[in-house]
Amino acid sequence: VVRLGQNFLADPNLLEAIVRDAQLRPDDVVLEVGAGEGVLSERLAGAAAHLHTVEIDRRLEPALERVAVLPNVDLHWGDAMKLDLAALRPRPTAIVANLPYSVATPLVLRTIEELPALERWTVMVQREIAERLRAAPGSRTYGAPSAIAQLACEVELVRAVDPAVFNH
């Protein structure tokens, strides 16, 4: 698991806060990138009409069995950067993800481009990525990702997360 840089959310209060922050509606179709051990997936499946959850690490298959059997869940194995997002049915209206540094910016930009029905992105990223995505024009960190993200949605930093809430 270390090879993939997996960090699993372990704090139940934070998991509930993420679901609240996502402001999911009962008719939402959620795309979760990085199912991990499925603890957030279960909560998302309970709050939305449908959940597409993506996990790259097959070693997590035993932990995700309880999520995969839920009637409103489609579990997709593989790299989210290679997944045919436009082919997902039903089409996602929200994304909730704890994104690793290496794919955070490209994946956010890819979902903006390829999933026009997305209404909300609730993504956990490293602080520097969040600051880059919400950077003001003319600032040192402003660039194409900032402009694209800000044209597509309102970018806000919701909370800082203590590293202690993760299991490695």
What are these regions (language model features)?
Residues 1-168:
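Catalytic cores of RNA-modifying enzymes
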